[in-house]
């Protein structure tokens, strides 16, 4: 990994919490020290940091974080200022400048906003600024949240074309079973095939965090399909990120990049955009898609949802499992009229189409291999 150009680090609230409440200032200082060390190696760094809610809980003297949405958002609004101020002071002491970037789900769901976020982050990195990214908890709608910063960090890694994502956590990596419940659990140091380990992840997070191992494996799916490696590292050994960059392999779990990676617009189609509905297809159409073909009307058996032309839809097999997603050339109303029909009949029914494809392969990303 000695040829890394850009690294994304995600630190969760469990790594930032002080045992007595609020933020652990020492943890902030350690993170700043790691970032400074990374920059001294000539590697650019983006930080995705939780902690706003925990910081707000400490600032307001609360014993636990609120459970309702309004309470969480109010506490996050208080805490985000505390969090970024601590980071700014710690980095400034090391000669570095940081920038706060708060992203909502819609910032990555809409293609134009996705590009704007991408351009802003690229400019910050050209200025040699450390972007510190968090979800914009204060205005997020529950149905349109990232859910956790593990997923956000993976999307950010794709957004900035990173080379490696490091997720700091409160365990040494991925285990064969939950190490907190099973003392015989063994650390899995390398993962080449995610499908072989998805079943072993425990879903529980900490009291202040929202992400368990399931969310980290989802982040690994996104990151590795983007063509990047991902490393799970215990936050108590965060300084070993420097060793990782220098080509050594510290204790933890490394997820290898997928053999078939997705690039450019197809990254946004797969994981950035929000789908408006579903198209159901027969087995023949599934086989065609897996061979790199476009989706034609003849293979479509049903639809669910309402959408207009050029919007994003899921494409499901007969069992309802998503096999692809893409930008559809027909509205849901138009597609209902022509589903199951051959191309000639479709074009005769809806004459103002540019081609016979319902979803062109250039505007489609496979979600299974």
UniProtKB/Swiss-Prot annotation:
PUA domain location: 276-349
Classification via Pfam families: AA_kinase, PUA
GO MF annotation list: ATP binding; glutamate 5-kinase activity; RNA binding
Highest rank taxon of the organism: Bacteria
BP GO annotations: L-proline biosynthetic process
Function, as annotated: Catalyzes the transfer of a phosphate group to glutamate to form L-glutamate 5-phosphate.
Descriptive protein name: Glutamate 5-kinase
Lineage of source species: Bacteria, Bacillati, Bacillota, Clostridia, Eubacteriales
Name of encoding gene: proB
């Amino acid at each position: 990994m000695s040829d890394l150009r850009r690294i994304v680090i995600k630190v969760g609230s469990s790594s930032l919490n002080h045992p007595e409440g609020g933020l652990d200032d020492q943890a902030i200082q350690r993170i700043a020290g790691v970032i400074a060390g990374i920059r001294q190696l000539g590697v650019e760094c983006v930080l995705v940091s939780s902690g706003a809610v925990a910081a707000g809980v400490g600032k307001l003297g609360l014993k636990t974080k609120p459970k309702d949405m309004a309470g969480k958002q109010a506490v996050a609004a208080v805490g985000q200022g505390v969090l970024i101020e601590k980071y700014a002071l710690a980095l400034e002491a090391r000669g570095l400048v940081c920038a706060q970037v708060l992203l909502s789900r819609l910032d990555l769901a809409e293609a134009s906003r996705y590009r704007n976020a991408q351009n802003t982050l690229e400019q910050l990195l050209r200025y040699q600024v450390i972007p510190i990214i968090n979800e914009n908890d204060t205005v997020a709608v529950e149905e349109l949240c990232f859910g956790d910063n593990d997923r956000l960090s993976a999307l950010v890694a794709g957004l900035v074309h990173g080379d490696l994502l490091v997720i700091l956590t409160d365990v040494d990596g991925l285990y064969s079973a939950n190490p907190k419940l099973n003392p015989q659990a063994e650390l899995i140091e390398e993962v080449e095939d995610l499908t072989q380990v998805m079943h072993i992840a425990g879903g529980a997070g900490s009291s202040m965090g929202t992400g368990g191992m399931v969310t980290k494996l989802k982040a690994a799916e996104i990151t590795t399909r983007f063509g990047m490696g991902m490393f799970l590292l215990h936050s108590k050994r965060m300084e070993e990120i420097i060793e990782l960059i220098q080509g050594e392999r510290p204790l933890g779990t490394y997820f290898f990049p997928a053999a078939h990676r997705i690039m450019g617009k197809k990254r946004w189609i797969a994981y950035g955009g929000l789908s408006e509905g579903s198209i159901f297809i027969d087995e023949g159409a599934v086989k065609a898609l897996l061979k790199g073909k476009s989706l034609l009307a003849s293979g479509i058996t049903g639809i669910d949802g309402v959408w207009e032309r050029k919007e994003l839809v899921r494409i499901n097999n007969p069992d309802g499992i998503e096999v692809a997603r893409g930008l559809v050339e027909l509205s849901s109303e138009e597609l209902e009229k022509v589903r199951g029909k051959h191309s000639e009949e479709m074009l005769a029914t809806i004459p103002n189409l540019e081609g016979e494809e319902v979803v062109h392969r250039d505007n489609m990303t496979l979600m299974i291999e």
